[in-house]
Amino acid sequence: MKHTHRKYVKTGFFLAGLSVVFGAFGSHILKSRIDETALNTFEIGIRYQMFHALALIILGLNHRKFSETKLNIALRLMIAGVIIFSGSLYFLATRALWTSESYAFVGAITPIGGLSFISAWLILFFGGFSNTEKYAAEKEELEENSEKKRHRSKKSQAQLND
């Protein structure tokens, strides 16, 4: 696995773990301190963070099936989406705890994070699988080599038995 892909997998692990921490924080600490609407907003941020953390892990581990350039762009967009979308939702949900100002402008950047998510998925949908033929050829070659080894092994076993 290339260093770049390992970095995405580790980022996915980190974001997944962080979403569990935020989930515990929300259900044990925030639940009694913010209203239900704010708590729901916080939970949406957690959900999207976890979905995209898992996507980072899965795509990073299966990087050979995808176009390198498009995969890197998509994964970076997912990370940006988590930071902008989920981050702004966390901020908006908890702002009542630490300020009386509205910070309504933060709500205006949330859709930018959503567009990052959508863009990442569209890039993967329309162009992500350009390495599929290469992957299929490599898989076929591995299977052929494995079959040849089995055949040679059977042949040498038969010669030993004779």
How does the language model describe each region?
Residues 1-162:
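Polytopic transmembrane helical bundles with strong interfacial aromatic enrichment
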